[in-house]
Amino acid sequence: MAKPTVVLLPVWGAGHFMPMIEAGKRLLRGSGGALSVTVLLMPAPTPDAAVDIAAQVKREEASGADDISFRHLPAVDMPTGHTGVEEWISRILRSHAPNVRAAIAGLDCPVAALVTDIFCTPALEVSRELGVPGYVYFPCSASMLALLLRSPGLDEEVAVEFEEMDGAIRIPGLPPVPPSALPSTMLDRKKSTYDWFVATGRGYMNATGFIVNTAAELEQSVIDAIADGRCTRGVPAPTVYPIGPVLYFPPPPEEQPHECVRWLDAQPPASVLFLCFGSKGLLPPPKVREIAAALGRSGGHRFLWVLRGPPKDSRHGQRVPTDAMLDELLPEGFLERTKGRGLVWPTRAPQKEILAHAAVGGFVTHCGWNSILESLWFGVPVLPWPLDAEQHFNAFTLVAHLGVAVPLGMDRRRDNFVEAAELERAVRSLMDDASEEGRKARAKAAETRVVCRKAVEEGGSSSTAFRRLTDDIVRRGAVQIR
């Protein structure tokens, strides 16, 4: 008889696809050969995303893993009439629900579980219809999960726009949250994206469990609050399995090290500020000018700045940066004035290799959770510059909850604008040896490096949670779908 399979339904995107695949591979290893993994592939919405996914699938298939297979779902029409990318992705997934149902029904082996992405609540309805346990793979923080679960209650309890509230918002397990730190999806309750957010939090209660890319030691108070029902008004929430950090480390290149890494090799330890705003992080010219001004007068601190150009197509889901034309984007003479202590890189850069380098002493990040986990894994303190989605909430937790960041003042109403003087102050605070604020962030980042690595070791908290997840899936049994 064929092995029971765990079906994965990932979405495209750097912080979504490979972490879920890595979690699936760990599930295989943890099952001791009792399970297989089937990955359902939705067509990516952009050519660049399709190329990335195809390359990653090819790598996995070439690795020779017998118990992991990939199945392509047919294309669906792209939705229209949405107010945000999160809602857009979720509507794509709702269109795929019949395809997911048909693909699972067509498997020739029993199905032990369906694991969906954060956006895939429609797939939880499919799992319930088929009688299969449905898990949400949550590639964000447990704090963000707590906010989502709390959102239906907040929607009923708060009568005004959250930004008009007096005082802070209470999320069990977290310090008081200022309304300015809420995700962009919560800031306009008249938009359908807000309705999507609240409906997602409500729909999550139909899950069997949450597989969260975090370590218990990083967010224990939040995980406890979810488990106690404090985020869901006393109703027991699905089980949380904190199994992170789950990070994808590609095979090392056979050729010589990347040019950015070679440049770092020539810099003193912990002397370089690394600036990178994610795979879709785009900075308009006014922000570029402020960063250049701050770096030009930030006390001579070294820097490595990944600066991308504007996208060719800015429709939802297609904001893919291009290679930057540095002479057009940067102030005249900037490269010459900073030559020797700074490198501006105009295309993709190997972020993990850079964060792992001993020369890097600080990280200006857009606060995507995957980038945060990488900085925690390598013990690099942070200057948070959130741009969109849940990133402002992540920035808040980095400063107020985890303590690994120096706060950066910004004007969210001006598209998250940061004045050069404020960025210069924050850079000095993070990087100067004499800064008490920076010293605390550096010390806390060094602690989290140890915590993250111990968590995934044999017997660590994340390793134990993964074993518990595997045992629970096997114990529940598998269903032969007809």
Curated annotation (Swiss-Prot):
Q: What is this protein called?
A: Malvidin galactosylase UGT88C3
Note the InterPro entries from the entry: UDP-glycosyltransf_plant (IPR050481), UDP_glucos_trans (IPR002213)
Q: Which GO terms describe its cellular component?
A: endoplasmic reticulum; nucleus
Q: What is its EC number?
A: 2.4.1.-
Q: Which pathway, metabolic or otherwise, does it act in?
A: Pigment biosynthesis; anthocyanin biosynthesis
Which residues participate directly in catalysis? H16, D117
UniProt keywords, alphabetically: Endoplasmic reticulum, Nucleus, Transferase
Intracellular or extracellular location(s): Endoplasmic reticulum; Nucleus
Q: Which Pfam families match?
A: UDPGT
* Any GO BP annotation: anthocyanin-containing compound biosynthetic process
Q: Which reaction does it catalyse?
A: malvidin + UDP-alpha-D-galactose = malvidin 3-O-beta-D-galactoside + UDP + H(+)
What GO MF annotations does this protein's record show? UDP-glucosyltransferase activity; UDP-glycosyltransferase activity
Is Transferase one of the keywords UniProt gives this record? yes
Q: Which SUPFAM superfamilies match?
A: UDP-Glycosyltransferase/glycogen phosphorylase
Identify the species of origin. Answer: Oryza sativa subsp. indica (Rice)
